[in-house]
Design a protein with these regions (language model features):
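Elongated alpha-helical scaffolds that mediate protein-protein interactions in large eukaryotic proteins
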Residues: 1-34, 38-75, 79-121, 129-146, ...
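Eukaryote-specific, cytoplasm-facing alpha-helical/coiled-coil scaffolding segments in long proteins
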Residues: 103-105, 150-155, 244-250, 288-289, ...
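Residue-level signature of alpha-solenoid helical repeat scaffolds
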Residues: 31-34, 75-82, 122-129, 147, ...
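Amphipathic alpha-helical repeat scaffolds
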Residues: 13, 17, 37, 60, ...
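Eukaryotic alpha-helical scaffold "rod" segments
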Residues: 94, 98-101, 108-112, 453-471, ...
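Domain-wide signal for the mature, well-folded portions of proteins, strongly enriched
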Residues: 492, 560, 581, 608-609, ...
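Alpha-solenoid helical-repeat scaffold
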Residues: 2, 234, 263-334, 338-383, ...
Length: 822
């Protein structure tokens, strides 16, 4: 700790004891705690407490107050815990009898102040800071502190209860790891003292008649097995297995969700399947006796573990598939029914009852569809999942939701009434439908899939969020259809024609969300299918390109931005790509570029301008702008617009455009193998000077938005590395053009001011002179600039001394520093 910090600390703590400060902002206290958590402040020796007796004096003074403020008491507990986190400082505080009074069972927990949740929260946080060494654990066990933590697990304050729960988990893990770094064997049950007390508490709670005690213990075990599932947790499970099994047999309703969470965490690890304690039997029993809603998470955990036994895996899969099987049965006549399952794990009437209830039907189907989405691409489940029947059931759900299916059973009629227009189920089903497009076995039902997708796209009742999901699923199926080896071109053209007809209507929707999602769908399709002849033919024969161009003038900025992106992809498809039917149409190219440049310079909103600069960068990257001379003029023109833009993301996009232009030179092959590399590099420097890019790059170094400055600095560092692969700053400062040095020194001085260099002047350096720019790149310390730009915005004031001064300034004891360091 610095001398100045030591000098100010007594005044800070004297201020905190002033009763007039009871209403001040708690941020002062948080800042002071931050001070003591700085590595330089929290010295792991006696030095901090010995050099600053005001610390122990403050702790003693607070304990001596007849009615201390709860917030000051909470702060005191946390401060004491931070100090006691060092073993040496812990021993000194123990000798002073301060820890017993603060953290012992007969200390603060036995006082009237304990009734305030702020004090209890501070106590738990203080203990959390303290338990970093074995003596602290022994202290808590011997003074009754651990019993206080057990009690706080059921604190009326959820924050306190949660913190106490997490503290117990950390204490158990820490006590075992420092006492026995090597793995336990099943025969070695000699737990350390702290672990013994926590484990006994768990065992006693599991045998308790109190539902809350049982839930807390199960919650504790769940957190333990979530963080550790090999080694000693196996030993812990052996001692708990029978009690867990008896809880399951008793069918305690309150404990069932926690039991499922516990077993789910254990089921993700293969070690428990091989361990003693009948884990497999317990999992099977839970899968059989609980409803699909309750057992679903456990079933998914079992299925995700590739080493789970086959019989348990099949039961788990049956639990997940049962609701989908019931949907197929509800939609079909008995003789037509081709289900997913040969037999059920639990009573089928249970699932039918859940699907017949308005309160449970939607939640069950959403949960089931979510689980299926997570399981579809698990390689070890490929042989178990009936993909075709699964796809059929998903399509059936979507037909139920929009009323396009006439149910063939009373159950189907009930489900149909519940699901009609259920957007939650529609969105979940469309997510799964899109993923199923990647499964080869599902290709046989392509016609049925597009029937339902087109029905959703055409229906005026499809709300915008569902329409977006429909577009996504349609896009996935169209991409897969185009890549299918035996695809029928006539079928593809028919589907594409229907899609573009619907898209024409959606692009004219009065709802901006619909227009926006339609444009995003078009952009995605065009990006991935522009090389396909059927796609280009269907696109160009529709009104979609014209309508898309019209939306560049949409009143909603989000729509204009999406229209820019879509027009960018359409331009590649229509004008730039060599295989385009209208490739080479110079007038159309120039017209499109001019429209986008106008948006970049005149649109009042940032989103469309960002979209334009992203589109231009993509065109340049793909080589669609033309020869190098054209690209140079294009980049220069765009950057002269971008450098004055008020949106920092547009300016950042401009830097990405410059980087792409630089990469053209970096990747450009030499015309002659004997051509010196310096000629190639000089050509790049000259092009950057002609295009006025250096002015933009150096100006960006002083940008008031840090990401822009950092990006410019990285780009200039990369440029210099390309020019001078073995560059050293010392060598560069000994060479160079002496007459130009004053202007370079001025430039470096300006750059050091960073964003404080207002109205970056351009008359001090000739940014269009190649020699001056080469000298600047060789001389300026970009590493230093990069380091400064990498500092956080508060690095100057976020120091122990500054924090202490800020606290004193806040309470009016000094006036020199009134800056809030946060």
């Amino acid at each position: 700790m610095s001398r100045e910090c030591c000098r100010l600390l007594p005044r800070v703590f004297a201020t905190l004891l002033d009763p007039r400060l009871s209403g001040s902002d708690d941020t002062c206290l948080e800042k002071l705690l931050d001070c003591f958590q700085f590595p330089a402040m929290n010295d792991l020796s006696l030095k901090l407490l010995q050099d600053n007796p005001c610390l122990t004096e403050f702790l003693t003074s607070v304990l001596a107050l007849p009615e201390p403020s709860p917030r000051i008491l909470s702060f005191t507990l946390r401060l004491a815990g931070i100090l006691a986190g060092s073993e040496n400082q812990f021993q000194l505080l123990l000798q002073e009898k301060l820890l017993d009074r603060l953290f012992g069972q007969e200390g603060l927990p036995n006082s009237t102040a304990w009734g305030d949740a702020t004090v209890r929260s501070g106590w738990v946080k203080g203990v959390h800071h303290m338990v970093c060494h074995q003596p602290a654990l022994h202290f808590l066990c011997s003074t009754g502190g651990i019993d206080v933590i057990f009690t706080l697990q059921e604190d009326p304050s959820l924050f306190v209860a949660s913190a106490a729960h997490q503290l117990l988990v950390n204490m158990l893990i820490f006590s075992i790891e420092i006492a026995a770094p090597n793995p336990f064997s099943t025969k070695d049950l000699d737990w350390p003292e702290c672990a013994q007390m926590i484990i006994k508490h768990i065992e006693d709670s599991l045998q308790s008649s109190s539902a809350s005690h049982i839930k807390q213990s199960l919650k504790l075990l769940t957190a333990l097995f979530e963080r550790h599932n090999t080694g000693w947790p196996e030993v812990l499970w052996l001692g708990m297995a029978k009690q867990i099994e008896s809880l399951l047999m008793e069918k305690t309703p309150e404990a069932q969700p926690m039991l499922v969470d516990l077993l789910s965490n254990m089921a993700r690890s293969p070690v428990f399947y091989d361990a003693e304690g009948n884990f497999q039997g317990l999992v099977s029993s839970v899968l059989e006796h609980l409803t699909p809603v309750q057992a679903g998470p456990l079933a998914v955990a079992v299925l995700k573990c590739c080493r789970s036994p086959q019989d348990v895996k099949i039961k788990a899969l049956t639990v997940v598939l049962q609701p989908m099987d019931c949907i197929l049965r509800a939609a079909s006549q008995p003789l037509e029914y081709t289900g997913l399952l040969d037999e059920s794990v639990s009573d089928p009437t249970t699932v039918e009852s859940l699907l017949s209830s308005k309160s449970s039907c939607v939640s069950l189907l959403c949960q089931t569809l979510s689980h299926l989405e997570n399981l579809l691409f698990q390689n070890h489940l490929e042989m178990y999942l009936p993909y075709t029947s699964l796809l059929h059931s998903v399509v059936t759900i979507l037909q139920f939701c929009n009323g396009f299916l006439t149910p063939a059973s009373p159950l189907g009629s009930t489900i149909s009434r519940i699901l009609i227009s259920s957007s939650r189920v529609q969105r979940s089903a469309l997510d799964v439908l899109g993923k199923l497009s990647e499964i080869k076995a599902c290709e046989t039902l392509t016609g049925s899939v597009f029937d339902v997708l087109l029905a959703y796209l055409e229906s005026p009742n499809t709300i915008s969020t569902v329409l977006t999901k429909t577009f996504q699923a349609t896009s996935m199926w169209l991409l897969c259809l185009q890549n299918q080896s035996g695809s029928n071109s006539q079928q593809i053209e028919k589907i594409l024609k229907a899609v573009f007809l619907v898209l024409q209507k959606r692009l004219c929707s009065p709802w901006w969300e619909v227009r926006d999602s339609s444009l995003e769908f078009l952009a995605h399709l065009t990006e991935h299918l522009r090389d396909k002849e059927e796609f280009r033919k269907s696109l160009l024969s529709s009104e979609v390109p014209r309508l898309t161009e019209n939306l560049l003038e949409d009143p909603e900025s989000y729509v204009r931005a999406s229209a820019v992106t879509a027009v960018g992809h359409l331009a590649i498809c229509n004008y730039f790509a060599p295989e385009s039917p209208v490739a080479g149409n110079q007038h159309n190219k120039e017209n499109t570029v001019a429209k986008l440049e106008e948006i970049l310079s005149t649109d009042p909103e940032g989103f469309p301008r960002r979209a334009v600069i992203s589109t231009f960068t993509e065109w340049l990257r793909r080589g669609y702008i033309g020869p190098l001379e054209d690209a140079e003029k294009f980049v220069s023109r765009v950057i002269q617009t971008v450098e004055h833009d008020l949106d920092w993301e547009v300016r950042l996009g401009g830097l990405k455009l410059v980087k792409t232009f630089f990469e053209i030179f970096f990747k450009k092959p030499k015309a002659d193998i004997s051509e010196p590399s310096t000629i190639h590099q000089d050509e790049c420097v000259q092009a950057f000077c002609r295009a006025k890019l250096f002015s933009f790059l150096f100006q960006s170094l002083c940008d008031c938005d840090k990401p822009v400055g950092q990006s410019a600095c990285h780009l200039l560092l990369g440029f210099r590395s390309w020019l001078y692969p073995f560059h050293t700053l010392e060598a560069s400062q000994r060479t160079g053009d002496a007459p130009a040095r004053p202007s370079i020194a001025w430039l470096q001085s300006t750059l050091r001011q960073g964003s404080l260099a207002q109205n970056f002047p351009t008359d001090g350096v000739d940014f269009q002179d190649p020699k001056t720019m080469v000298l600047a790149l060789d001389t300026i310390n970009f590493e230093e600039l990069n380091s400064e730009l990498s500092n956080s915005s508060d690095y100057v004031v976020k120091s122990p001394l500054s924090l202490i001064q800020d606290i004193l300034a806040t309470v009016g004891t000094i006036e020199e520093n009134e800056v809030d360091c946060y």
